[in-house]
UniProtKB/Swiss-Prot annotation:
The lineage of its organism: Bacteria, Pseudomonadati, Myxococcota, Polyangia, Polyangiales. It is an enzyme of class 5 (isomerase). It is found in: Cytoplasm. Pathway: Amino-acid biosynthesis; L-histidine biosynthesis; L-histidine from 5-phospho-alpha-D-ribose 1-diphosphate: step 4/9. It comes from Sorangium cellulosum (strain So ce56). This is 1-(5-phosphoribosyl)-5-[(5-phosphoribosylamino)methylideneamino] imidazole-4-carboxamide isomerase.
Length: 241
């Protein structure tokens, strides 16, 4: 299971939200590009989210994303970018900046045809984010909850050359209380795509538990890493167990 650090961008800074709430923000680094360069020393892939873009529905932090991609990709690192990608033009712009993968969440619910089209044109470079609140997929920067489930999204994309599904339990994101192992296991067993797990990781034991779930190919970590619950080296070892 691949360990993938997250950099969430807000106002040009690296931050984390608590349970997806924009009124509960912790700033971890005022220079996201420098942070990305440090992470590249140990990690092959980075997960970057334009939080303002996720709310606005279009890229907002493009300059900060560009700097992060340049810093992390300077020595061959791969960056996946999400937040506000709801059009082909937005997707293409990030790929042109050097993103290895693009992450689409709201578009997967509201415009699955767009996701299928992009996956077909860029096979293996589209990640679909399914961010769940009480079992339903949240959209528009997690501020609205749709009527569909994570498995509904997966079924709508069956057969598309999607790289992975990124599953987040929003109620656990930024809490370090532990990931939703049951929901992650059920999705991985049923969706037909590799699953990236996210939300709630707070210990090495959480990473080891996720690593034992068949079909989970990666895990996104943020707050626990930046607040010292474990070192990057320890996390990579636990994820590989």
């Amino acid at each position: 299971m691949q360990l993938i650090p997250a950099i969430d961008l807000l106002g040009g800074q690296a931050v984390r939200l608590h349970q997806g709430r924009y009124d509960q923000v912790t700033v971890y680094d005022q220079d996201p590009a420098a942070l990305a360069a440090r992470l590249r020393r140990a990690c092959a892939r980075l997960h970057v989210v334009d939080l303002e873009g996720a709310r606005a529905g279009l890229p907002v932090q493009a300059d900060a994303v560009r700097a992060v991609i340049a810093a992390f990709g300077a020595e061959g690192g791969s960056v996946q970018v999400g937040g506000g990608i709801r059009s082909a033009a937005a997707a293409e712009s990030y790929l042109a900046l050097g993103a290895d993968r693009i992450v689409l969440g709201t578009a997967a619910v509201n415009d699955p045809a767009l996701v299928r089209d992009l996956a077909g044109r860029f096979p293996g470079r589209v990640v679909v984010a399914v961010d769940a609140k009480d079992g339903r997929v949240a959209v528009q920067g997690w501020e609205q909850v749709s009527s569909v489930t994570a498995l509904d999204v997966a079924r709508a994309l069956a057969g598309a050359p999607v790289a992975a599904l990124l599953y987040t339990d929003v109620s656990r994101d930024g809490t370090q209380v532990g990931p939703n192992l049951e929901a992650t296991r059920e999705l991985a067993a049923s969706c037909g795509f590799p699953v990236l797990a996210s939300g709630g990781v707070g210990s090495l034991a959480h990473l080891r538990a996720l690593a034992q779930i068949p079909g989970v190919s990666g895990v996104i970590v943020g707050r626990a890493l930046y607040e010292g619950a474990f070192t990057l080296a320890e996390a990579i070892e636990a994820a590989s167990a």
